[in-house]
Amino acid sequence: MKDLETIILPVLEMSCAVCANNVENTVKVLPGVEEASVNFAANTLSVKYHPSLITPQKMREAVQEAGYDLVVEVEDPTAVQEEMAREHYRKLRRNTIGAWVLSIPLALLGMVFMHTPGGNWIMMALALVIMIVFGRSFYVNGVRHALHGSANMDTLVALSTSIAFLFSFFNTVYPRFWYEKGLEPHVYYEASGVIIAFVLLGKLLEERAKNSTSSAIKSLMGLQPKTARRVRDGQEEEVSISFLRVGDLVSVRPGEKIPVDGTVSQGSSSVDESMLSGEPIPVVKSQGDRVLAGTINQKGAFLMEATGVGSATVLSQIVQMVQAAQGSKAPVQRIVDKISGIFVPIVVGLAILTFIVWLVVGGSGYFSYALLSAVSVLVIACPCALGLATPTALMVGMGKGAEHHILIKDAFALENLCKVDTVVLDKTGTLTEGVPEVTDSFWISEASRDMLDILYTAEMKSEHPLASAILSWLKGTEAAEIDADSFESVTGRGIQMQVHGVTYWVGSKGFLETFKAMVPPEAGREIIRWEEDGKSIVYYGWESELLAVMAISDRLKPTSGEAVEALKEMGIEVHLLTGDGKRTAETVAAMLDIRHYKADVLPSDKEEYIRSLQAAGKKVAMVGDGINDSQALARADVSIAMGKGTDIAMDVAMVTLITSDLMLLPDAIRLSKRTVRSIHQNLFWAFIYNLIGIPLAAGVLFPVNGLLLNPMLASAAMAFSSVSVVLNSLRLKWSKL
């Protein structure tokens, strides 16, 4: 069976959180679907599925049967969704304006000029136009959901306004019914019209605010140009980037954005990669160098060969990761989804109960109060505020992170990150620049050409970061690669190689001890001096004899000290792990004011160290560059990988810091705390709003002070409850990290 695939599809026709639940539950039960998650704030469906068992088109058919729709089998579904969203917003704005233009005179007739001749008939006509022309979608959607055995916010609006209108219509056509009972026949046409006007206004403001929550994704997608100049048979032709294929030649001129990932095949230039890497200095590119989509060519013109197009570009992968993260669900959202699923039926039940209680307590004389209270209960209840509480905060938080070169994998990672109280830092590539260089060497005896050739060959076969430093150092010695009998890399220790039956080795002090090689006193004194300067020591020998010792320096990043201090100010305990010797570890720890450190650690030691911290009740984040860190990253509560924009280890860690700036680490933790706090605030206010609003609408205060909530005010409260949740989430966007 083919491996699982993940696809993100735009969803159409959703109006509230209940709709999102309906779509999600519809897709979840389809054969071949492993996971399905709907983000109401983004109007997207994320599905993990088996392509051999089900296709996106089959998913669409199932969703259509449930009364909704998906955008599939188009070249750019996101662009289609954006265009549909723009059209939806324009239509919503027209309906809102139209509803208010008629609702204002309707409200004046109903509340100020009540005794206007023929006033009831005029109000009935105005209300009918508002309902049929501008509020039509509420009734269409409400009926559609009823036919599918479900209910949503549209159901509540359709029910409440229809009840108010039909009651008023009856009283207009047949007022004698109430006169015969000695009662005044009241009409509430203004309630029908103004409720729709307020709900439309709320949805308009909500849509506008929701669009702001996705601005980060839009700005990322906007980095990539829409067209490119493809070169064929020496001729340039401007084509959509969707037509580019791997292997195509593309011409890039000064000042243009690079359209796809590729390698320079002719010419040279300097490229601004700051939008991906965060590095402000342009990078010189010449033949054979890699260039990335979305980066800006500055001075020269060049030809490039496309190596990554469409969804295979680094920029697209970042966008996909952020979209997936925004669509993920925090653990608390699962509870909210269950509540949203039964919310509307419960509200309808409460409205019926309210109506019955009023009639039982007050009799037929309280019929109008009973009706108004039931309508208010239907109107004031808002599943949207609950449904928007978590996803809007996640969208803004994840988007802000992406804008600041922080990629958070999902809501689970975000929630765990905010709980971290201990950070474990790997030295090489995390605290240091990751650009090591040999600064000193000590040969026990004079270096022969054979010794240099064997060392060069060993390092050529090694993938360790320090190997590149030794190779660069050997370039000036004319050392050359030779044939070796065998080669073995020993994780955490070094490499050993057989040449003509003799074992040569290069590595750490642990390797030195494994081969029981002795360090001469004069070499030992040099080693102590180098370690006190914070340098890494590499030993080179054959069998049990030491041949040479090299000191390798990897400068600390300018922001490492500031980042460590920022973490400590946040109350986070900082630990340093390194494979270097004790003196080197002590020196680096002292330079950065890190109290907890451990030297001479192997990859397995890192995992055990984190396990011991967790056993002591710590919530641990491990920060590394992905090299020799995989076990420790997997063990940590939160794994954080350092990247450089062009080489993002997105599959390695829960959090990826795209640039090499360690200050992103405290920024990421601050962002997680603020996002989670925003989620909790949103949920608190959404629940409190409904817990207080529904009893008020039912008339619980009427026996105390005669207060009865007008349905129009109830609709205004409902409209602005969801808007307030989105606005609270947007505070994240405007805050500084």
Task: Report the location of each language-model feature.
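Membrane-embedded alpha-helical bundles of multi-pass transporters
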Residues: 112-115, 147, 166, 400, ...
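Transmembrane helix-loop-helix hairpins at the membrane interface
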Residues: 91-227, 338, 441, 709
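Conserved catalytic phosphorylation-site environment of P-type ATPases
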Residues: 276, 372, 382-458, 613, ...
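Juxtamembrane coupling segments of multi-pass membrane pumps/enzymes
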Residues: 8, 179, 193-254, 285, ...
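Conserved ATP-binding TGD loop and adjacent catalytic N/P-domain core of P-type ATPases
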Residues: 4, 408, 499-501, 542-681
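Conserved cytosolic catalytic loops of P-type ATPases
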Residues: 31-53, 57, 189, 218-312, ...
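Signature of the cytosolic headpiece of P-type E1-E2 ATPases
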Residues: 103, 466, 475-587, 602
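Flexible metal-binding regulatory segments at protein termini and peripheral loops
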Residues: 1-118, 219, 235-238, 316, ...
